[in-house]
Amino acid sequence: PHDVGGYFDFSPGDEAQRVRSDITRALLALRIHVEMAHHEVAVGQHEIDFRYEQALHAADNCVTFKYTVKGIAAKHGLIATFMPKPVFGINGSGMHVHQSLMDTKTGATRMYDPSGMFNLSAPARQFVAGQLVHARALAAVVAPTVNSYKRLTPGYEAPVYICWAQRNRSALVRVPRHSPGRESNTRVELRFPDPSCNPYL
């Protein structure tokens, strides 16, 4: 790893911050809307979140993102890896996918229900249930390598339990807290995909 920083670490002269800034500028030039870029928990680990899109466009953005990161890292004399668990004994890298359901005719969210558990609608809860029921089969697609399973171990904020929760990062599906007035942002986070997966599947 190129640094020993921690979560949201930032210090003057931070080479990693310069690289993240270059990556962010390049992604914006490629019309990928970056929402956040910061150091993650593990040494040499970084997170760059980009804005939601329709599924196919999001998959395109994911592939473009990887090529961009690798190219800019190389220009800085670094090697970027998207391995789920490149270093034993520290947190691995996931590719958490935030998902929402929209009405195809109106574009309105189908996720929100003020009377539902965690403010989730019945279709949203059924959507989550389907992913939990089929989690083992989905793992072949979203965690497709031997290294994927080195990440999915207890103690490293990895999703190791087939369940859903609001605050427990060990859950396969997390439900971000509801923000009043932002009902259209209601979503669920599928936490067990990792960067080695094919985003088109």
Predicted feature locations:
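Glycine-rich, acidic/polar active-site loops that bind/position phosphate-bearing ligands
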Residues: 1-201
